[in-house]
């Protein structure tokens, strides 16, 4: 499918609901920056050129997902840089059943302004949003909630909500981080409510939801008639109507 030269407004946040039995199928990544030669230098990536980087990063996605026919990949932004004509081929190369893409700052410039986005369709493989709010349900009870965004949203702490984000290119060793976002990354690590799912801090691979659910994330179960659940739902409804 050819890239269409048409500006499109993409809305959000969108609410995704999953049963607890599905959490083994959910993976996160961010800040792939396909075709971005300078990102190799900026982030000290161990690749000789963009061709090698693209191959390794997309091979790693498919190796991590494996042969799971129900795999869901949530990308927290900055999918591609520069040559967006490769966008469709790169998306098609990913084995996931469903791909949720958050709009990153580079996506706005390099994809959104040149492409007509497909409206939400349960049968479509790819869906774009400005932000996601993910609910995990255990039968009739809400098991946990977290937000998914490109920029970290750690001020969104309602009822212990956790945030998965990208943008910062947080490395594994923060002591060696001297980038412009180093101080922010350190504060977020201390905060404990945000997790940077970007490739630079996760061995250039996606992370599985079950691998980042424990430790930092507050677990709870709320029935829909619980007062706190009603408060949370009111917050979401107000946020979605903006």
Give the label of every model feature segment.
Residues 1-87, 191-193, 197-201, 237-242:
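N-terminal active-site segment of His-dependent metallophosphoesterases
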Residues 6-18, 92-147:
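Extended active-site neighborhood of metal-dependent phosphoesterases/phosphodiesterases
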Residues 34, 81, 107, 153, ...:
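Short, glycine/acidic-enriched loop or turn micro-motifs at the edges of active sites
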Residues 76-95, 108-127, 156-159, 174-178:
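Metal-dependent catalytic neighborhoods of phosphoester/phosphodiester hydrolases
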